[in-house]
Design a protein with these regions (language model features):
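C-terminal lobe and pocket-closing loops
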Residues: 206, 211-271, 306-307, 314, ...
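Surface-exposed aromatic
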Residues: 290-302
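Ligand-binding pocket segment of bilobal, Venus flytrap-like solute-binding proteins
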Residues: 73, 82-85, 168-230, 312
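Periplasmic-binding protein-like
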Residues: 276-293
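A structural signal for short loop-to-beta-strand junctions that line the ligand-binding cleft
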Residues: 102-114, 240-250
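Short, low-complexity disordered leader/linker segments with a strong preference
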Residues: 1-29, 325
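Pocket-flanking alpha-helical
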Residues: 46-50, 62-103, 121, 176-181, ...
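Bilobed "Venus flytrap"/periplasmic-binding protein-like clamshell domains
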Residues: 29-55, 59, 117-184, 301, ...
Length: 325
């Protein structure tokens, strides 16, 4: 990490947002932990990587395919990634050593509060599933191992009074694998936490002979907040967000963050934060959920972990004060 910081600060010290082109600079590589190819983290991470590579001379950034939030946090904790996408609940667990991070705290700081993640509980017509309680006895994918989806899915199932390991047959599949299994009749429902629309869910909704159905679950927010704090919020996915689902459906939201190691260099984090806000339109062209990257959202408490001082410095310049302790 120290070698990475030293090299990167050297190349960005005098950098504005001009296209990279200096051939005499040693290339510095940045790894951005994202998610699976069928989700939203990966394309947004790819967009961010392209921006860093384009506008910061000497930097070559790469979006890495991962299992998602928990894997990204573990990569940062192991010094194998410099920036990571994560859901706020997974980040909270990591910094406090809870759940999958028991005995393995990760020193993190918030780079930006990015966009809200929408829990999807997805099935198709003919499955016999019309409510959360109908998941009992069914074959259900709760998300890939070491993913934020799995963490939130397990908590949501418990919020409705069910045991995810006893009351259903649980599969641990990525969103792309879950959609494929649902198409093939190998599972009855899937959980997925991501932006709206998520490409894989859109693909399912467009499959001939399949009519998508989103299951209401927003009422689980109260029990989740009682146990885990105000990270989880009741919201709704609007009608026609996916082809064939013509109802508004209640859901659980948890915000997505970009995080960095707590010891990341202030100037590095300042530059990345500045780039994201001042070239936001390029990220929006990659996925519309980047439109949620707003200055006002940074100070709402959506992130349960402090901001990195470098990010806070840029935000202060823009009139926004955030927690750094």
């Amino acid at each position: 990490m120290r070698r990475f910081i030293a090299g990167l600060v050297a190349v960005i010290a005098a950098a504005g947002f001009t296209a990279a082109g200096a051939q005499d600079k040693k290339t510095t590589r940045i790894s951005i932990g994202t998610g699976g190819t069928g989700g939203v983290y990966y394309p947004l991470g790819g967009g961010l990587a392209a921006m860093l590579s384009k506008y910061v001379p000497g930097v070559e950034a790469t979006a890495e395919v991962t299992a998602g939030s928990i894997a990204n946090l573990q990569l940062i904790g192991g010094g194998k990634s410099e920036v990571g996408f994560t859901m706020a609940d997974a980040a909270w667990d990591a910094v406090n050593g809870f759940d999958k991070f028991t005995g393995r705290k990760v020193a993190l700081r918030t780079l930006v509060v990015f966009y809200p993640n929408r829990m999807h509980v997805v099935t198709v017509e003919g499955s016999g599933i019309n409510s959360m309680k109908d998941l009992k006895g069914k074959r259900v994918s709760t998300g890939a191992p070491v993913s934020g989806t799995e963490v939130t899915a397990m908590r949501l199932i418990e919020a409705f009074g069910m045991d995810p390991n006893k009351d259903m047959t649980r599969e641990r599949l990525s969103v792309a694998e879950s959609v494929s299994a649902l198409k093939d009749g190998k599972i009855d429902a899937l959980f997925w936490v991501g932006g709206v629309p998520t490409p894989s869910i859109t693909d399912l909704a467009a499959t001939p002979g399949k009519t998508i159905k989103l299951i209401d679950h927003g009422d689980g927010a109260e029990n989740m907040r009682k146990k885990f704090g105000p990270i989880y919020v009741k919201n709704k996915i609007l009608a026609n967000a996916y082809p064939g689902e013509t109802r508004d459906t209640t859901n659980i939201d948890v915000w997505n963050l970009l995080v960095v190691p707590a010891d990341a260099d202030d100037n590095l984090v300042y530059q990345i934060t500045k780039l994201m806000f001042e070239k936001k339109d390029e990220l929006v062209r990659v996925h519309k959920d980047a439109g949620f990257l707003e200055l006002a959202n940074q100070a709402t408490g959506a992130s349960p972990i402090p901001f990195h001082p470098g990010a806070a410095r840029y935000l202060k310049e823009r009139g926004i004060t955030v927690n750094v302790k």
